[in-house]
């Protein structure tokens, strides 16, 4: 994928590569989350907002459960932060992919918000195949597609709550840890570059 001549090409390639298993997985899992949020009494607006702002299924489930229990805001914040702490090592391991990108390093704080299991695995797997100055655009195209499919899934699950058995919604949520395990196993054979990406 070194022939990505423009940022737009890289963005669209990221979009195209996300369509399929990554987007479908998040769409399906977020259907389960949307029905769970409806069951706990969250509004559709808050359910979608929590997806965009928290962007991590464990943290989102903690948010919904603590909200349903009437926990104070500080408890919700600490619970979400603790549940999503797994993103710290994922973020640290992925940042070298962007080391040679020409963007201002301050943007890494914003970029890191879009990291998910899908994007982390994708960039560690394909990052070295993409020109350094196109990696951020590719990442944003891939991530935005995953997030958008997740938001659509939340909406779908919220609206279909009444007709969806609870067991189905819980099974859909459980897709995420299963997928994470499968990705981890499938990428253990990869030897990541030990030198900076070029």
Question: What are the functions of these language-model segments?
Answer:
Residues 189-198:
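Single conserved hydrophobic/aromatic residue that forms the stacking wall/gate
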Residues 45-51, 80, 165-176:
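Structural signature of hydrophobic alpha-helical transmembrane segments
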Residues 78-166:
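Helix-loop-helix junctions within the multi-pass membrane cores of secondary transporters/permeases
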Residues 1-54, 65-78:
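Helix-loop-helix hairpins and the membrane-proximal interhelical loops
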Residues 26-28, 170-183:
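Hydrophobic alpha-helical segments embedded in the membrane of multi-pass proteins
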Residues 47-49, 61, 76-77, 109, ...:
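Alpha-helical transmembrane segments and their helix-entry boundary regions
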Residues 7-14, 38-44, 70-74, 103, ...:
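Short juxtamembrane and helix-loop transition motifs at transmembrane-helix boundaries
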């Amino acid at each position: 994928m070194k022939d990505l001549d423009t940022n737009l090409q890289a963005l669209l390639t990221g979009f195209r590569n996300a369509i399929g298993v990554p987007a479908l997985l998040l769409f399906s899992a977020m259907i389960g989350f949307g029905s769970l949020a409806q069951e706990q009494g969250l509004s559709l607006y808050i359910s979608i907002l929590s997806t965009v702002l928290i962007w991590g299924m464990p943290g989102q489930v903690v948010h919904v459960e603590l909200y349903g229990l009437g926990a104070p805001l500080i408890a919700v914040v600490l619970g979400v932060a603790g549940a999503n702490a797994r993103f710290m090592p994922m973020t640290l391991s992925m940042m070298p992919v962007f080391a040679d990108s020409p963007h201002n390093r301050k943007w890494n704080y914003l970029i890191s918000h879009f990291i998910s299991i899908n994007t982390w695995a994708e960039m560690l797997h394909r990052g070295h195949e993409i020109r350094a100055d196109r990696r951020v655009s590719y990442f944003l195209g891939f991530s935005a597609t995953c997030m958008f499919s997740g938001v659509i899934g939340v909406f779908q699950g919220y609206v279909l709550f009444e007709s969806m058995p609870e067991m189905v919604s819980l099974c859909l949520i459980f897709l995420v840890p299963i997928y994470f395990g499968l990705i981890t196993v499938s990428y253990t054979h990869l030897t990541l570059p030990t030198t900076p990406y070029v």
